[in-house]
UniProtKB/Swiss-Prot annotation:
HAMAP family cross-referenced by the UniProt entry: Thz_kinase (MF_00228)
Gene symbol of the encoding locus: thiM2
Name of protein: Hydroxyethylthiazole kinase 2
EC id: 2.7.1.50
Binding residues annotated for substrate, in chain numbering: M41, G193
Pathway where it operates: Cofactor biosynthesis; thiamine diphosphate biosynthesis; 4-methyl-5-(2-phosphoethyl)-thiazole from 5-(2-hydroxyethyl)-4-methylthiazole: step 1/1
Keyword Cytoplasm belongs to the record: no
Family listed: Belongs to the Thz kinase family.
Reaction(s) this enzyme catalyzes, per UniProt: 5-(2-hydroxyethyl)-4-methylthiazole + ATP = 4-methyl-5-(2-phosphooxyethyl)-thiazole + ADP + H(+)
GO term, biological process aspect, one: thiamine diphosphate biosynthetic process
Cofactor requirements of the protein: Mg(2+)
Length: 267
């Protein structure tokens, strides 16, 4: 895609603060390391600002929310807003939890650089009909035409913010650009945490000076292309998980990986 430039090699080993869930934190940490940056996970309100102030990007994931974690998230998001720290918010579970949906809407006031979610989560957040259950998207929610128009309107309300919507076709929407991307494989749904990983990789690319739109396109494409390189015939879940992380560390050596992105960018 001509709109994107290769972010590798990573120019500086940025510290990425991930406020995420206990299920996927190891995968996120290893994924960030595979790209050449450093992860830290701190969600105790007593220390959260110490780590956020040292970081070059903040990733907030709402999985496994608690009252204490919510307090820490609000503290970190406020600091990110006041200090212009790039921030990604992953709206996990807003289709089911009114607490999470309310929190995400509050976090919009802190102007995250990227707001991420699956098709059902984002449809729920912007007030469209959805069929999401738990933290999973529904196959019934993959219609993009109505969602795209609403997101364009939201981008005018929240200038400078990009939306990253994951699905069979990934949507990235900003004030002036829309990308529809088509890389990936169904096997990524075999293991938990791959959606969370996209958010963490987005934070990595933000830490390198990419815009929200660029970082979102790079992150979702990088993971999807890495997964496409894996031969999955006869492969079990644990082997596939291992190979995903393995390919994340190898793909950055390919100077032409951007040429394998499938999709279009529209102005």
């Amino acid at each position: 895609m001509q709109a994107l430039t290769n972010p590798f090699p990573i120019g500086s080993s940025s510290l990425i603060h991930c406020m995420t869930n206990e299920i996927s934190c190891e995968m996120l940490a290893n994924g960030i390391l595979a790209l050449g940056c450093k992860p830290v996970m701190a969600d105790d309100p007593r220390e959260v600002l110490d780590f956020t102030k040292q970081s070059q990007a903040l990733f907030i994931n709402l999985g496994h929310l608690s009252a204490e974690k919510e307090k820490a998230i609000r503290m970190a998001a406020l600091y990110a807003n006041q200090s212009s720290l790039p921030m990604v918010v992953d709206a996990v579970g807003v289709t089911t939890s009114s607490i999470r949906k309310s929190l995400v809407k509050d976090l919009l006031d802190y102007r995250p650089t990227v707001l991420k979610g699956n098709m059902s989560e984002i449809r729920s957040l912007v007030g469209l009909k959805h069929h999401g259950v738990g933290v999973d998207a529904s196959a019934k929610d993959q219609e993009t035409e109505d969602l795209l128009q609403v997101l364009k309107d939201w981008c005018q309300t929240y200038p400078g913010m990009s939306f990253l919507v994951t699905g069979p076709k990934d949507l990235i929407v900003s004030e002036n650009q829309v990308a529809v991307l088509e890389n990936g494989c169904a096997e990524l749904d075999w293991i938990t945490g791959t959606g969370d990983l996209v958010g963490a990789l987005t934070a990595v690319f933000l830490s390198q000076g990419k815009t929200g739109f660029e970082a979102s396109c790079l992150a979702v494409s990088y993971l999807n292309i890495a997964a496409e390189k894996i031969v999955v015939q006869g492969m079990g879940l644990e082997e596939f998980r291992y190979q995903v992380l393995n390919q994340l560390s190898l793909l950055r050596r390919d100077e032409n990986w951007l040429d394998t992105i499938k999709g279009e960018v529209y102005e």
